[in-house]
Each structure stands twice: as C-alpha cells, then as structure tokens.
Amino acid sequence: MTSLSNSLSADAGRASLASAAGGEVSDFFALLKPRVMVLVIFTALVGMVVSDATVNPVIAAISLLMIAVGAGASGCLNMWWDADIDALMTRTAKRPIPDGRIRPDEALAFGIVLSVGSVLILGLASNWLAAGLLAFTIVFYAVIYSMWLKRATAQNIVIGGAAGALPPVVGQAAVTGHVGIESLVLFAIIFIWTPPHFWALALVKSGEYARAGIPMMPNVAGPDSTRRQIVWYSLLLAPLALVPVWLGFGGWLYAVVGVLGGLGMLAGAVQVYRLREGEPERKAAMGLFAFSILYLFLLFSALLAEQGLGLFRAVAA
C-alpha cells in the first residue's frame, strides 16, 4: 500500500511539474503577442507576393518566421517596459508580468535574445537590408514608441504606427533585396489605417488609459476632436487603399474590396461621430474597431488571392 501511495504521489508530482512547465511556456509565448504576430506574418507575406520577383520558398519561409519572431520580441520588450501601467488596466492586468507569472528580468532577457537572433538569422538567410529593416522595426517599437512616444504624446499611435506598418517592407526586402513602390504603398495603407482603428478603441477605454497616465487622443484633445480625426483619416484611407489598382498590382477583386471596405470604414467613422453618448456610442466605436480589422484583412487577402490566381494561370499555361 505504501509503495502504491508513493507511486501515486510521484505521478501526481510529475503531472504537477509538467503542468507548471506548460504554463510557463504559454506565458512566455503570450509575451510575444501572438495575435499581433499573425497579422505581421500575413502583411509581410503580402509584401513578398506583390513583388515582381521569383520567390525562393525556403528563404521566404525562414524570412517570415524571423519577421514574426522579431515582431514578437518587440512585443515582449514592450510588455517588459509597460508592466507598471499594464497592471492598472483591466484589459492588460492579466498579462504574465503584471500578474506575477514571469519576472521582468526574464522577459527582458527573452526579448533581447529573440531580437538579436531574429535579425542575425534573417540577415544570414536572406539579406542584410531586410535584417536592418527588421532591427529598425524592433527598435522603433520597443524604444521609440514604448519607452518614449506612448507616454509622451497623443500622437503616439500615429507616429508609432510606423512600426506596425513596416512588415510588408521587410517582407519585400527579404525576397528581392530592395524596397519597391508596392511595399511602400502597403506601408502607407497600414499607417493611415492605424489611427482610426486604435482611436475607436481608445474612445471606449479612455478611462483606463487616463488611469494609467497614457495620453491617448480622447484624453488629451477630447472625444469630439478624436471623432473628427477618425472621420478625416477614414476619408484619406479610402482613396489611398485604391492606389494598388492604379499602380497595377491590384486587380478587380482588390478594387471591389477596396471600394466597399472604404465605404464601410467611412460609414463606421460617421456613425462614431454622430453617436456621442452611452451604449450607442460604445457600440459604434467597438463596431468600427472590429470592422477595421476585417477591412484590412479582406484588403490584403484580395491581393493574396489575385497573386495566387495569377500564379495558377501562369503554371496552367
């Protein structure tokens, strides 16, 4: 009986240890902001496929992985720096560092190792232009945005949005060795898309941002000014999103998605501008926030679909 008890205790101990190890791995993975990594992979891939070049699939796969790891590393460093304010916001209080599941020094070391590793491997596997752009993206997000802009100016999202807009540029550089007009246009689309996307959320979460001391636009310029700027950015985004059609790397499918999506963004922005009180305001803002994600996804998916269809036709011919 004693032997059986000891065996059961040992099994329980091993299970507990395995569970703890699994939890720690998932916590470190959470530091990488996996949902952001998925978006980075997606937009970087589009930057690759719109390039007028023969793409080596192995180099492309390694490059996408390293771009994703680099983005995750910058997210990890962002969480390390922002642990104090994350603890004050409901949306972020359960992140691994403020919740006490990972020590700040562990997160810092993890982020630095991944940053250096991703840049070096991308440089060796692809080229040093792409590696340099990835390094710039990491530094811009982790240092310039996280450590300076985020707590210093209401334009934090506008300027800092450059980091989130760079993956298509890095992706194109990785497979071609240069930066072309295609990826620069994609950069511009994401850059202009970012403010209305995040400010819609900021209108709803303004109280939390104020409590954390983050100068988001609704807390600095006021909700009315923020709503007007959301409309103006949406007006600018609609025609900008159609530039790929004018340049010839966006076809009819992309044009349809661009027109309908642009009108949808504008309609959502006007709705946010009109509804200014209570639950209707919150629903309008969160509706625009959600639609903006769908809009960008469909826009870039249309480019992927058209490039895939073009490749299929070329092979079939």
From Swiss-Prot:
Coiled coil: none
Top-rank taxon, per record: Bacteria
Signal peptide coordinates: none
Transmembrane segments: 36-56, 57-77, 108-128, 129-149, 157-177, 184-204, 230-247, 251-273, 284-304
Keywords per UniProt: Cell inner membrane, Cell membrane, Heme biosynthesis, Membrane, Transferase, Transmembrane, Transmembrane helix
UniProt membrane topology term: Multi-pass membrane protein
Further remarks about this protein from its record: Carbon 2 of the heme B porphyrin ring is defined according to the Fischer nomenclature.
Record protein name field: Protoheme IX farnesyltransferase
Gene name of the encoded protein: ctaB
